[in-house]
C-alpha cells in the first residue's frame, strides 16, 4: 500500500487459461492490501488457523519432498524407523488426508518421464492418513528389490466441502493466513519448518474477520498441522513457491487447523 503498512496477494496457475480470472485475482489482492493496513500486534502462541490454499501448498510440499526412501531407510528422515525400517503402512496424519502424484491428471499434469528416463505413473503416497509408499530412485529400488517410483513430481491432496467463509464463521478466535515466505528447515526428522506469514494475515473473532495483524513467525510441521485438522475445503491449483511463480504442480484445499504454533512477531510487510 502507499503508506507501506499493508500488502495483499492473490494468484492462480493452470494449464487451461480459461480457468484463470485475472480481474478477480486483481480485485482480491487489492482488497487484501486495503484491509491489511495498520495491522495490530498480537501475542504469539498456538492459534486456530484458517489457511488459504496457497499457504497449505507452501507447507504440504515439504511432506512430499521428504518422501525419499533412501533417507528413510538410512535413518535420516521423518519416515525412518529404528533398525533400518520405514513408516510405510503407518498412519501419520488425519485419515481424511490423501496425497498423490498423477502426471496424467489435467489439473496437475506432470512430465511423462523422469530425469533418469523412466515412464511416470500415478503414485499414491499417503492414503487415508497412512503412508503407502516412498520415493525409490533406480539405484535404491534395485538395491532393495523394488520397482522404482516414477511419479512425475506433481502433488494433489484430498479435500472436503467446507468453504473458507464457513471455516471463519465456525472460529471463535483464530487467524486467517494468506501465504508464507522465508520458509526454512529446522529439523528434518520431524519436517519442522520456520517461516513468516505475508500479504494478508487477519484476526478472527466470534466468526468474523475483525482486524489485520502483524505478520508472525511460525515454528511447526505440516505433519503436525495435518494431524490437527478441523475442516477442509475444495482443492484448487496453487502457486506454492515463495515467489508466487507456477513452480511445481500442486493442488490442495483450504484447511482449518487447531494449535498452530506462532513463536514471534515480525515487522515485515
Predicted segments with their positions:
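Alpha-helical structural elements
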Residues: 12, 73-74, 108, 131
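Mature, solvent-exposed C-terminal subdomains and processed small-chain segments of exported/organellar
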Residues: 68-81, 145
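Internal alpha/beta scaffold segment
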Residues: 1-67
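Alpha-helix boundary/capping detector
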Residues: 55-59, 75, 239
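Dual-mode signal for accessory low-complexity, basic/Gly-rich regions
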Residues: 82-269
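N-terminal processing/targeting junctions
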Residues: 28-34, 67-74, 119, 189, ...
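Basic, gly/Ser/Thr/Pro-rich low-complexity segments located predominantly at protein N termini
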Residues: 11-16, 50, 70, 80, ...
Amino acid at each position: 500500500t502507499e503508506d507501506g503498512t499493508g500488502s495483499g496477494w492473490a494468484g492462480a496457475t493452470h494449464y487451461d487459461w480459461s480457468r484463470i480470472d485475472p480481474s478477480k485475482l486483481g480485485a482480491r489482492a487489492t482488497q487484501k492490501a486495503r484491509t491489511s493496513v495498520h495491522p495490530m500486534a498480537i501475542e504469539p502462541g498456538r492459534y486456530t488457523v484458517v489457511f488459504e490454499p496457497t499457504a497449505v501448498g507452501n507447507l504440504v510440499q515439504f511432506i512430499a519432498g521428504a518422501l525419499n526412501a533412501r533417507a528413510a531407510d538410512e535413518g535420516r528422515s521423518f519416515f525412518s524407523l529404528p533398525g533400518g525400517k520405514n513408516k510405510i503402512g503407518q498412519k501419520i496424519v488425519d485419515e481424511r488426508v490423501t496425497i498423490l502424484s498423477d502426471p496424467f491428471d489435467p489439473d496437475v499434469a506432470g512430465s511423462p518421464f523422469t530425469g533418469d528416463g523412466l515412464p511416470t505413473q500415478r503414485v499414491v503416497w499417503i492414503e487415508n492418513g497412512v503412508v503407502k509408499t516412498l520415493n525409490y530412485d533406480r539405484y535404491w529400488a534395485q538395491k532393495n528389490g523394488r520397482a522404482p517410483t516414477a511419479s512425475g513430481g506433481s502433488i494433489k491432496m484430498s479435500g472436503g466441502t467446507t468453504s473458507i467463509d464457513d471455516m471463519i464463521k465456525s472460529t471463535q478466535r483464530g487467524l486467517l493466513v494468506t501465504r508464507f515466505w522465508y520458509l526454512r528447515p529446522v529439523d528434518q526428522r520431524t519436517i519442522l519448518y520456520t517461516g513468516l506469514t505475508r500479504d494478508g494475515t487477519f484476526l478472527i473473532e466470534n466468526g468474523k474477520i475483525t482486524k489485520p495483524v502483524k505478520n508472525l513467525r511460525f515454528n511447526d510441521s505440516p505433519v503436525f498441522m495435518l494431524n490437527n485438522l478441523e475442516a477442509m475445503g475444495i482443492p484448487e491449483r496453487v502457486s506454492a513457491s515463495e515467489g508466487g511463480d507456477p513452480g511445481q504442480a500442486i493442488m490442495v484445499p483450504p484447511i482449518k487447523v487447531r494449535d498452530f504454533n506462532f513463536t514471534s512477531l515480525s515487522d515485515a510487510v
